[in-house]
């Protein structure tokens, strides 16, 4: 989201050039680095450092950008204001299912297979390849590509691998789909059905869905207490200043870029790992600066700070629900972790 905002302020397409700023160059939430100047320099025959200087100068009058600097001969590092980063807490829920959308792949066309039962694949590798192509289609569509979904089932063997069918029967199709989706190309695709069926935070499939359900339960709990986020116009971005909140906002700010990058590289496993990082950021934020009191921990229960934290919970839930859906998996609103000792028990 934020990298797209910066590109829009420059009036250029910069998809595929953004990276988190490296340590030592302001690598904190709200700071972004781009190699855009090198791309533009190649096209124009100019020196990258000169192009980067022009880009930095163009950003000087933008009120929500606090700094733009040049490093390593042409890399542009941009820092947005804390208020701009915190504003994602309102922007993400407002965008809803479109919060992962961008125009990064606008003008691209591709075919993608319709969703199919993973148990019908003749091998683990075939199941992974099929699923990767299906998810890539959804990610590409979110990034602005024109995607034609086609039914290729007549080309596929329908006998199915017994081990795959057994894994689906034991762990469920969602768990198997997620485990295959996060498997890197070239790695053995066979999965441990028992491991991906565990209801604990050590299981990535459970963790991302649990984080979504946890954020949803926070919002339900707040409603039961009569608490309200209020209108977007009353939101106070300056109140989301805790390091845990800023870390979560920093991860949220990359959602459209991570979806587009995974589509471009045909690597849904990279997007699954992004979601796992987002889930961890939300649960870490809740532990360090909860939106509501729990387990003896204090938290504001009314006023603008409580409202700001509830907006952030809504942003986390919206982003997780959207991302999990792009992987073709359901995002439940009620889910409980086994053996969590209360720390991560659903608050409502």
Name these PLM-found stretches.
Residues 1-348:
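Non-catalytic interaction-recognition regions
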